[in-house]
A protein has these predicted regions:
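Extended, low-hydrophobicity, Ser/Thr/Pro/Gly-biased non-transmembrane segments
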Residues: 1-59
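Alpha-helical structural motif
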Residues: 6-8, 39-50, 54-57, 92-99, ...
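Juxtacatalytic substrate-recognition/specificity segment
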Residues: 12, 39-42, 60-156, 160-170, ...
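Short loop segments at secondary-structure junctions
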Residues: 17-19, 135-136, 184
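Short secondary-structure junctions and interdomain/linker hinges
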Residues: 19, 50-52, 86, 106-110, ...
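Acidic/polar loop patches that form or flank catalytic/metal-binding clefts of enzymes
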Residues: 20-25, 109-115, 165-166, 188-197
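Secretory-pathway/luminal and periplasmic proteins that interact with or process carbohydrate-rich
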Residues: 51, 124-129, 184-191
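Acidic/His/Gly-enriched intrinsically disordered linker/tail segments
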Residues: 174, 178-234
Length: 234
């Protein structure tokens, strides 16, 4: 099943060969060496989460790992990317610690084993401990990246914990996640930062939402053709 309502815990056991290794969700349990360069790597994810945000990442990842001192204790952090892309990724995640502080300040303690992001070929998704993060963003400005990784981090409260009952109420997780980026700007630049983020967002929505989504749409219930549109995500 693949839904917002069903929740489960997970065990991952993935066999791979060559330079490819599982970088999984949750806690690393170990690696079993098989014949040649084949291994089985195992992870356990013990917090119940909606089934649509369970995934595996398998490649020749290089890992940057460190610990952030959060408001409620230490928060392990991992950034994973192909070796050639890791430095560019790290250079654009300079304010991730600030985003963690903002989320814990407004939403409460971070509830998962680590904060983690993995570069992918396309798209972003709030996979807990292994957020899928588009590689193209490593060529974008620091501020654009800050908005996106803050959005995805906000989902670890709004989406991974608080979840809509049906896809037509997607606003319930996307609205607060997007606003998380605004709160991060406030943390960095004060009231002026928040006001600019909110006003820029409002102007974009007023100009573009009805153009992009075939007219003005109600947030709830959002018609199926426009669930992943501008109204929902901005």
């Amino acid at each position: 099943f693949d839904s917002f309502v069903e929740r489960a815990t997970y065990g991952y056991h993935v066999k791979s060969a060559g330079t490819y290794r599982l970088h999984g969700q949750g806690t690393f349990l170990g690696e079993q060496q098989l014949a040649g360069d084949t291994v089985i790597r195992s992870y356990a994810f013990d917090q119940p989460i909606p089934t649509y945000i369970s995934a595996v990442a398998i490649s020749d990842y290089a890992i940057h790992a460190y610990t952030h001192n959060g408001a409620y204790g230490e928060v392990p952090v991992t950034l994973a990317a192909k070796p050639a892309n890791l430095n560019a990724m790290m250079a654009r995640f300079l304010d991730l610690g600030t985003a963690i502080d903002v989320c814990e300040h407004w939403y409460g303690p971070y509830g998962f084993d680590r904060v983690g992001y993995v570069l992918t070929t396309d798209g972003a998704l709030e996979i807990p401990t292994n957020v899928a993060y588009p590689q193209l963003m490593t060529g974008q400005p620091v501020s654009s990246n800050r908005g996106l990784y803050s959005h995805e981090l906000g989902h670890h409260w709004w989406g991974c914990v608080v979840t809509p009952d049906i896809h037509n109420n997607m606003w319930l997780k996307e609205g607060p996640a997007e606003y998380t980026g605004h709160l991060v700007e406030e943390w960095i630049d004060g009231a002026a930062g928040l006001q600019k983020a909110v006003k820029d967002n409002l102007l974009f929505v007023l100009r573009q939402a009805h153009v992009n989504d075939d007219g003005f749409q109600a947030l709830s219930p959002m018609p199926d053709p426009h669930i992943y549109g501008t109204h929902t995500y901005y």
